[in-house]
């Protein structure tokens, strides 16, 4: 009841003024994207969805929309899917394979491949196929990415070693936390190349048999657009202490994840996903803008 016990000690902690935190989020963008995301999740009856938009030059997260977002006055704990849930990236993972091959110089954007519908590989446990059946095609590496060909990506992946692909995954930050200022971040799930057995060796080339978060995926795409330099993403721009001093978060040192020339080539190849007549993202065209995409 608050009464002091005889012989007891009283400890008083003086109140301390709190500070102010300024986020990197763009309020208008966040609101619009949140509405669009909620509508798409409802339309497709998905379990959840997340959208991350990152400024590639600064690492500032302009949007982090999550389908389970609640009103700000609801203080109950809730999961942030964008940083806490990992998933297989699927065909977005083809960027890692193509990027690694460009980085090693085993291909160029115009390298030509004879791409079948199915590849029968002795150690794959069954054929590797494309999403849709087709006759054999002659495609450049750019065409392989534009059409999102599984078999074409495997042919590209076979020009480099498994260790080189794994090194590119790690260079993009897969398998480690991004360092964003949010608790409970998942590092994703990725096994070393020496643990890729049978079919896993091939399906990792197109984004299966490993898992990353939406934040990791956004960071990897930002790295490509930033000349191959990976920087720590931030959702906190600064904070002001009670004494008026302003501090900004410090991330880890930038990492040159891939050669700048290779990154530029890959970014241009991503534009073909939108611009090519057989590209998988023609609907993403925005008049007056160059748009680079990889569908998943």
Regions inferred by a protein language model and the residue ranges of each:
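Beta-lactam-recognizing serine transpeptidase/beta-lactamase-like catalytic domain environment
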Residues: 3-9, 51-87, 96-296
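Extracytoplasmic/periplasmic proteins that interact with beta-lactams or build/remodel peptidoglycan
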Residues: 1-50, 70-73
